[in-house]
Structures are given as C-alpha cells and as structure tokens.
Amino acid sequence: MRVFELRLALLTSAMAVMTVPSQAVANDSAANAEASSVRAGSRQFTPDFFTTYAPVTALDMVKRIPGFSISEGEGRRGFGENAGNVLIDGDRPSTKSDDIWTMLSRIPASQVEYIELSEQAGADTETQGQGQVINIVRKRTAKVNGTYEGTIIAGTRYGFQPSLNASATLRRGETSYELNVSSYSERVYGFGPEDFKTGSAVLLERRFYNGTGGHDQAALGGAIKTKLGDSKVNLNGQVRWDDSFDIREADYFNGSGVDTADELLLRGGPVSDISYEVGGDIEFSAVPKTNTKIVALYRSGHESAYSSIEIARMGQPVTLFETRSRNTPTEAVMRIQNDWSGLGGHAVQFGAEIAYNRLDARFSVANSVAGAVTSFPASDVLVQETRFEPFVSDIWTLGPSWKVEAGAIAEFSKLTLSGDSIAERSFQFIKPRAIATWTINPQTTLELRAERQVAQLNFNEFATSVDVTVGNQVDAGNADLVPEKTTTFSGLIRHKFLERGSIQFRGDYQLVDDTEDLVPITVRDSNGNITAQFDGTGNIGKSKRWNAELEITLPLDWLTRPIGFAGIEAKYIGHYHGSKVTDPVTGLNRRISHRPLWHQQWDIRYDMADLGLVFGASFSVQEPNYAYFLNEIRRQHEGTRSTLFIEYSKFSLGTLRFQVTDMAGFHRDRYIYAGTRASGALDQIVNRKRTLDPLLQLTLSGKF
C-alpha cells in the first residue's frame, strides 16, 4: 500500500508538469537577460533574476536557482573526494568544519556580482566528480560589508531562546579580511508513554515520560585572502563551543494502573566541548600551462558525554546507572593538485593527498544499588590511520554538447588500534570514476556515471558506548570493522522550463562489498568461552542498493496570471531507497538497517514582490526506519513535519520572518525475541510514543 501511495504521488507530480500549457513551455526558449547562457552547459544568473525573492544572502539566491540542489559530498574517504558543488570566487573553501550553507549565509546578496551554473562533466577542476556546479562571484569593493541575523525560538513550556549570527568582510587592494560570529540555542519539550508488553501483547507496565532537551553552540571564525606576487593565498580558522542536555522524568504504572516507580534521566553530550580548525591553500603556476594548488588542514577538539538513569521502585533499593565518555579526535590533511591544459580539448588533473586521523576514546560505566557501587572495566581505545592517495583525472571536451570526465584514485592506508582493542590492518583500493554529460539542448541535460567509492570509517564505531534510553543497550566497539566499498551505476536527466521551473530524475544501482550494518559482537574469555554478546557496527558481506529521486520545481504563473496574480511556486522532492542484504542472524534476505524506503517533501511559497511579503509552507514525511539487532527488530516512525512562515522584506532593519514548526514526533516499536531473532519466539514488545511541542520562531536578517 505504501509503495502504491509513493508511485501515485510521483505520477501525480509528473502529470502536473506535463499539463503545463505548451505555449508557456515554449516561452523558455526566449532570450532571458537575467539568466543568460554564456556557453553550452552553462548559465549565468545576475542579481535581477532574484529580485522577486528579495534575497538577503547568497544562500537565499542559491536556493532559487532552478534545478540546483547543494551537495556537500557523500561521506567518502579523503578531502578531495568530499568536494561539494559550490564554489566561492572560483575556489573551494579549505575547511571541513564549516558547512557551505553557513558560508553562503554570510555573503550579502548585494555583494554578489553573478552566479554561474555549469551542468557538464568536470564542471570545474575544484569540484571533480560533480556534474553540476555553481560559482558565486562577488563584487570587488573597498567598503565593509556583511550580514546579520537574530532569532528568537520560543516554546509553550520552556520560554525563549535567542541566537545571533553576524559576518563582516573588508577588502584592501588584493587582500580581504573576513570575520564571523555565530550562536545557536534550541529547546525541545517532549512527552508521551512507553508500553512494555508480553510477546502476546499483554500490557505489563506503562511508563509516562516528559522532559526537556536543548543544544547551545557558539563559534568564532575568520579568513584572509590575498596575493603574494602571482600566487593566491587563503587562510581560515574557526573555534567552536558546543553544549547540550536532556532531562527526562517518568512515572511507572503496572498493568492495573498502579503507580510502581519513578525514573530520572540526565544526559548530555557534547558537554561544553571546544573544537578548532585551521586551514589554508596556496595556488600558483610554476610551469607553463600548469596550475598548482596546495591545501593544508588541521582540526581537533573534545567530544564528551555523560548519562545517568535513576530508578526507584516501590519496596526495592534505588538503582543508578551512569556512563561517561571523553573522546579526542584529530585530523591533518595535505593535498597537492596540478591542473594541466597543455593538450587541446583536455583538462588533466593529477596530484596526491596524505591524511592522518586519530581518535583517543575513553569510556566508563558504573552501576549502584542502594548506594553500593559496582564499576565496570573502562573501555579505552586509540585509533590511528594514515592514508596516501595519488590521483589523476582527465576532462575531455568532445564538442559543445558532450563532455567526459575519467579518473582514478589509488589509496594506500594503514589502520591501528591499541588499548583495550588491538588490531592492525593495511588497505589498498583503486577508485575509478567515469562521467559523461550530453547537453541535448539549452534546457535539457543527460548525465551518466560509473564509479567505485570507499566509505569513510566512523572511528567512534571502534569504541564502546551505552544507550540508557533503551534499557542500557550496549553498542560494542568493533576492532574488525573495515570500510564499505560501493560500485555505482547511475543516470540523471534534467529539464528546465518556464524560465524558473525544472524537473529532474536520478536513478542508480549499487553493488556493495563489506556492507556496514549491525552485527553480533561476541566477547570471549582467555579459554575461548563466550562471556557476552552485544550489538555493534560491523560488516555483513555483499548487498545491493537501488535509489531514485524525483525533483520538480513548478512556477504557477501560467495558471494564476490570467486571473490576476502571480508569484506562486511549488516544489516536490521524492526519494526511494531499496536494498537487499543477507541477515547475519537469520540467514534471510532483508533491507539494510537505518535506511527508510522513501522520503517525500512538498514546499509552496507565494511571493508578493510589490508588498515585500512572502507566504510559505513545507511538509515532509518518510517511511518507518528499521534496525536489526541480535535479539530485536526496532521500528521507528516519525510523523509529518510541517512548517508555516511569513516574511516581510521592506522593514527598515532587514527582513522579518515569523515561522511555526510542528515538530515531528515519533513512534518506536521494539520487538524483542527469546534468544536471537533466528528463534522466531517473540518475548517482549515495547511501544514508545513521543510528542513534541511546536516551535515558534521570529527572525530578523539583514545586510550592510
């Protein structure tokens, strides 16, 4: 039924585009002064194109480019492979801590000269592997310019939480100085029951929870961009503070409704943690027809967390379970890339990247009953990885309509674990890639690609942790974890219409080796006897994945202008994610854990440019998420998240936005089996429901 509903939604959306009057579609071929094609596969957007939307920042402008979505990489290994599809003044920022959304929000819309969109293979050497890239080109001015944004988030049960973001840029000749400060504060109030039942669904106990959680963050960053002779030099840095908390209380009732116990949960993480990053690059030409860029990056910090859960049952001693963790991650990267244009019709890039990653993870657990404390052995693990990656690629222009990018990366890496887990492994991978794009006409692009990818390891999976919210469930560190390898074949077709409209369909098929999923982790004594079994992230062999994405942006002026108004735009994004893997516990085929089958989002906005008003709404929903543990199947279903907003852009101090968000609560169902899932004997059912208070948000944003 759900699959039918998904197909119906996709079909309905596609039909909406097909029913657009043919005359309106034909108008797209007319010349457009605000968004002109500068070469095949490329389009330039001047500020006039965005006037209707009254943008404050470059991010506001990028969001309105037809058929374009920001990509920040896909969790692959290496700095180069995680290149996004956004450039600023032709450069990729030499940072991993600052996301591109934040960086674009610091650029005033008034300082954007134009935005160029390229939609061909090898669209830019700075973003190899991306078939669609935008470049935000800023004006050169000696004036100080910047952006500011102040927000108050309010809830009915926790008051007001303010946040502030500001940035400023100063240019002096060939040098620019950038400074940015930001803060963020959020509170969420949640409540709802959790029912514990027998395998035959007889109620044993009901727990009613209510609690408040929050996250606070502050950051200070800056950058200097200059020229030394003919060389371009960029330096950047950031320091960030993070803190969060979760306080939850519960009353326990038996199946007859009698109050039997009280619970208090305290949890935090990060806990006033400080992290920092410094990076930079230098770009120069040492030999004719060759451009060289050297990138260096270093980041480190602390990641701490704590949790405690105290339960007082009638007539029984008070129990207290506590955990503490303190992790120190470190990363250092250096990359040199050379772009050679000495062969007509080709753009060759070659170079190498070297990286060092380190995680010092410390974890402890203690349990007390009636004040008597039992301390468990601490889990201390040091994970270190060194990686060397030479690479080469060639972008071949076959004509005005065809471009091909082909390349390969070789990886040589060594991973060591010491402390409570001891292991050492070496990896060698070849990661080839081929992309071809055909610009069928100025409105239509076809992209085909085949590539081999290696996923980035999450070093935290080598360390042990405990989730006190689901019965003190242990996530055991796995010293045998190796990177997931994926071979992907994909295709994409994109069509633009009505000047601001677009439809895009993407599909891919993936063959996966060493699939990452939940696996049973066995603990043995010195004699080889099993002492315990836990769940943890591990590799479960080969799997297959297939994905589809439909994105439609539909301006409705062709429909509404005949009846006297214009400015309504609708957008739909639908994702489908299929998968098949052999379960390590049952031996049967199933989907991969933590991979919802589908996700859909609908957006609609009405821009009243003359009045400076915008009305809008957004709705998103996804299929339940499943996870497969040793003795449990866990199903979590989040509700529909809805947002309504109104903006006024003619306020003297900037743009005012009032927003109401109906937070998506969730239902979590745990099906716990006697022994393992392979037994098929259902022992316990746990149903949890959480409802969240809506959020009210008032934002003032402006530029100077």
Residue ranges and their predicted role:
Residues 273-275, 327, 381-385, 425, ...:
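Outer-membrane beta-barrel signature, preferentially recognizing the C-terminal barrel domain
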Residues 302, 360, 414, 424, ...:
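Surface-exposed extracellular loop regions of Gram-negative outer-membrane beta-barrel proteins
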Residues 92-119, 166, 222:
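Short acidic/polar hinge/loop motifs at secondary-structure boundaries
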Residues 648-704:
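C-terminal beta-signal and adjacent terminal beta-strands/loops
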